[in-house]
């Protein structure tokens, strides 16, 4: 199975055989977006056009296969940037028509879960934080599985009953995604782009307790109770937090004081990680979820991995974290989900579908 990913600024091509990863080749256009402080859709789309053929050729060479050896093709058809998605979808359709291979249009977010099925892709985060080094892989998911996806475009908690046709959205951000908030706060603090790694690194030098930033949607009117759930019990909001950081910086500057950038970075990060991990664990406990997969680019954040692992362990939940190279956007995760669709007997999507930038997570693959 060959997988193609182009939903944002990474051009990814991955090849799997069943649940065995053969190759995962990624070309990122991140450097082209740095001076703008964020991803520019037009630049990302043009970068995909330039990178696709070399990335495909490199992937086939590393896997030691040809297009004739490929049984089927899977491509991310949403959600994501419309122009970026279009490049990958058009490339996949061209390959499918030229080779006569079946084509599967799959959901980018569910693919982040599918990557957990690849053999030998687990890592352990220390000794006591319940990050599993086993339990996924070999094409079998735990019976009561959830997924916490945290990236620049998405922050969601999912319940996975079947990776191929039964995915439920339990909670999501109602405004900015966590990764987007990191980028915007990094810009406020003058740390550059991408903001996630910069804030994570600087936060180690600061005191997270020096400033108390708000945790969005945690008031009783939003949370409710286990018996009578509030309207946003498992949802997140980061726009107010971003505004609070901006006002904090303005207050220091208005008083003519030096802005404690490291302390603000640490306090901001603690606010984000605190509310993400607490709500995710709450959703898991109240839905009988015993295993949760952490994915998305922000899964690289050291404090998110640490605190989520600690809280999962305290709740008796096993946290699974793929290697960082498979947490971010890549073609291997698309191929992994595509392979599962074939093994489940799901029909291909054909070539008449269109990319869907707002594709709901409940749509695992596009029917013909």
From Swiss-Prot:
Gene source species: Paenarthrobacter aurescens (strain TC1)
Free-text function comment from the UniProt entry: Required for the formation of a threonylcarbamoyl group on adenosine at position 37 (t(6)A37) in tRNAs that read codons beginning with adenine. Is involved in the transfer of the threonylcarbamoyl moiety of threonylcarbamoyl-AMP (TC-AMP) to the N6 group of A37, together with TsaE and TsaB. TsaD likely plays a direct catalytic role in this reaction.
Source taxonomy: Bacteria, Bacillati, Actinomycetota, Actinomycetes, Micrococcales
Alphabetical GO biological process terms: tRNA threonylcarbamoyladenosine modification
Reaction(s) catalysed by this chain's protein: L-threonylcarbamoyladenylate + adenosine(37) in tRNA = N(6)-L-threonylcarbamoyladenosine(37) in tRNA + AMP + H(+)
InterPro entries with a match to the protein in the record: ATPase_NBD (IPR043129), Gcp-like_dom (IPR000905), KAE1/TsaD (IPR017861), TsaD (IPR022450)
Name used for this protein in its record: tRNA N6-adenosine threonylcarbamoyltransferase
UniProt keyword terms in alphabetical order: Acyltransferase, Cytoplasm, Iron, Metal-binding, Transferase, tRNA processing
The protein's required cofactors: Fe(2+)
């Amino acid at each position: 199975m060959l997988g193609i990913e182009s939903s944002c600024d990474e051009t990814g091509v991955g090849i799997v055989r069943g649940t065995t990863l053969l190759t995962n080749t990624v070309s990122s256009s991140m450097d082209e977006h740095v001076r703008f402080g964020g991803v520019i859709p037009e630049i990302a789309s043009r970068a995909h056009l330039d990178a696709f053929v070399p990335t495909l050729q490199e992937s086939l060479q590393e896997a030691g296969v040809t297009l004739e050896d490929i049984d089927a093709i899977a491509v991310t058809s949403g959600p994501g940037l419309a122009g970026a998605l279009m490049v990958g979808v058009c490339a996949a359709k061209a390959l499918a028509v030229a080779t006569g291979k079946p084509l599967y249009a799959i959901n980018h977010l569910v693919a982040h879960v599918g990557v957990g099925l690849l053999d030998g892709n687990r890592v352990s985060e220390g000794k006591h934080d319940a990050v599993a080094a086993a339990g996924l892989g070999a094409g079998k998911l735990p019976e009561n599985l959830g997924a916490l996806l945290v990236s620049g475009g998405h922050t969601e908690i999912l319940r996975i009953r079947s990776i191929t046709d039964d995915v439920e959205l339990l909670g999501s951000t109602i405004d900015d995604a966590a990764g987007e908030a990191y980028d915007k706060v990094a810009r406020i603090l003058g740390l550059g782009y991408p903001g996630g790694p910069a804030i994570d690194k600087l936060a180690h030098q600061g005191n997270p307790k020096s400033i108390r930033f708000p945790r969005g949607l945690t008031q009783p009117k939003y949370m409710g109770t286990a018996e009578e759930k509030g309207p946003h019990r498992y949802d997140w909001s980061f726009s107010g937090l971003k505004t609070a950081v901006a006002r904090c910086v303005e207050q220091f500057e208005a008083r003519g004081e030096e802005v404690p950038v490291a302390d603000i970075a640490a306090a901001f990060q603690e606010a984000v990680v605190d509310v993400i991990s607490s709500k995710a664990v709450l959703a898991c406990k109240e839905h009988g979820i015993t295993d949760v997969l952490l994915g998305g680019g922000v899964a690289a954040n050291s404090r998110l991995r640490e605190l989520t692992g600690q809280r999962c362990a305290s709740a008796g939940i096993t946290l699974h974290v793929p290697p960082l190279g498979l947490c971010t956007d890549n073609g291997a995760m698309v191929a992994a989900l595509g392979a599962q669709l074939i093994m489940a007997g799901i029909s291909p999507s054909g070539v008449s579908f269109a990319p869907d930038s707002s594709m709901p997570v409940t749509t695992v693959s596009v029917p013909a």
